[in-house]
Amino acid sequence: MATVMAATAAERAVLEEEFRWLLHDEVHAVLRQLQDILKEASLRFTLPGSGTEGPTKQENFILGSCGTDQVKGVLTLQGDALSQADVNLKMPRNNQLLHFAFREDKQWKLQQIQDARNHVSQAIYLLANRDESYQFRTGAEVLKLMDAVMLQLTRARNRLTTPATLTLPEIAASGLTRMFAPTLPSDLLVNVYINLNKLCLTVYQLHTLQPNSTKNFRPAGGAVLHSPGAMFEWGTQRLEVSHVHKVESVIPWLNDALVFFTVSLQLCQQLKDKISVFSSYWSCRPF
């Protein structure tokens, strides 16, 4: 019995030593690695005043789709804003070519990119507050930090992977509609958003439902992409989507950022798992 107790005490001493090493050394090594990765991620979101001199570089993205050539265009991205847009739309009925572009005095903020960058900055801030001089005293303290960092990273990733669901009246009321010169025809709606690593442009063609229409009017709810046949009210009119054209272009640095988010989340989870292993040995007290 004494031998068993001695072995148990020796085992506990070894585990306690391993846990102290984990708290004092490995945790900080992981935090350094996380900071390095997230700083690389933050560099992908190039913005004025981020330490580089001069204006943020402009990137041109040619929009296309393997399913249609009705819409062609180029969007110019500058940091988290669209600074230029040049779009050509071939009308299906008569092949008339419409051209519209951003007014020179206008930029359109891509809130998804701005929000993702802000969440990355918050994650870096949380990590920087626990520098090498900080001594973690409990595993629970590490878990709390990892949960907070993972929350920010998950929110950053979700802002890029989950575009907002908008109703057609919300799209119609958007300031984006008033960005163009010449003014968009009243039978067109435009939406721009990020989906994963892609910059997406959707053009909706509309037609007015006559008061004597036999169609059963059902206003469409919110959606990332509305389908032909979706209906809505705008002012005194009832409108229906007749055609939908979606084109997109890959933004390589957004793909990099998403990879950095995934790797960082995995590192956080691995550290949480290591900490949690010790809880099974000290289930009756804080670990």
Curated annotation (Swiss-Prot):
GO cellular component: axon; dendrite; nuclear envelope; perikaryon; RAVE complex; synaptic vesicle
InterPro entries documented for this protein: RAVE2/Rogdi
Protein family (similarity comment): Belongs to the rogdi family.
Principal cellular location given in the protein's record: nucleus
One Pfam family from the record: Rogdi_lz
UniProt keyword Hydrolase present: no
Key words, A-Z: Acetylation, Cell projection, Cytoplasmic vesicle, Nucleus, Synapse
Gene: ROGDI
Self-association state and partner proteins as the record states: Monomer.
UniProt organism field: Bos taurus (Bovine)
Modified-residue entries (N-acetylalanine), positions: A2
Transmembrane segments: none
Location relative to the cell: Nucleus envelope; Presynapse; Cell projection, Axon; Perikaryon
Protein name, entry field: Protein rogdi homolog
Superkingdom: Eukaryota
